[in-house]
């Protein structure tokens, strides 16, 4: 007879890598065109003036300027330019 029991197997032991979602710049920060503002799944934050939305719902700056957040029923992110 064996002196040790068999090890068996488990169905656990795997986990996905974190996706680093969330806000990347705060309100009042100066950004350049093309800068990523938010990484998200779905539209927790919505694009407003001078902000674009990627196919994965990422929000990015379309113009140089200052980031501004506005909340009504939804939270909107816009870029205020100097002009």
From Swiss-Prot:
Q: Name one GO biological process term.
A: translation
Keyword annotations from UniProtKB, A to Z: Ribonucleoprotein, Ribosomal protein
**Region named Disordered:** 1-22
Q: This protein's superkingdom?
A: Bacteria
**InterPro entries, alphabetically?**
Ribosomal_bL27
Look up keyword Ribonucleoprotein and say if it applies: yes
Pfam short name (any one): Ribosomal_L27
NCBIfam families reported in the protein's UniProt record: L27 (TIGR00062)
HAMAP family found in the cross-reference section: Ribosomal_bL27
Protein name stated in the entry = Large ribosomal subunit protein bL27
Where does this protein come from, organism-wise? Answer: Protochlamydia amoebophila (strain UWE25)
Q: Which gene encodes it?
A: rpmA
């Amino acid at each position: 007879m064996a002196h040790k029991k068999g090890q068996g197997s488990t169905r656990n032991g795997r986990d996905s890598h974190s996706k680093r979602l969330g806000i990347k710049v705060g309100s009042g920060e100066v950004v350049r065109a093309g800068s990523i503002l938010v990484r998200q799944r779905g539209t927790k934050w919505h694009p407003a003036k001078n902000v674009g939305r990627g196919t994965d719902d990422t929000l990015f700056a379309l113009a140089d300027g200052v980031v501004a957040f506005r909340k009504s029923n939804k939270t909107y992110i816009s870029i205020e330019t100097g002009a």
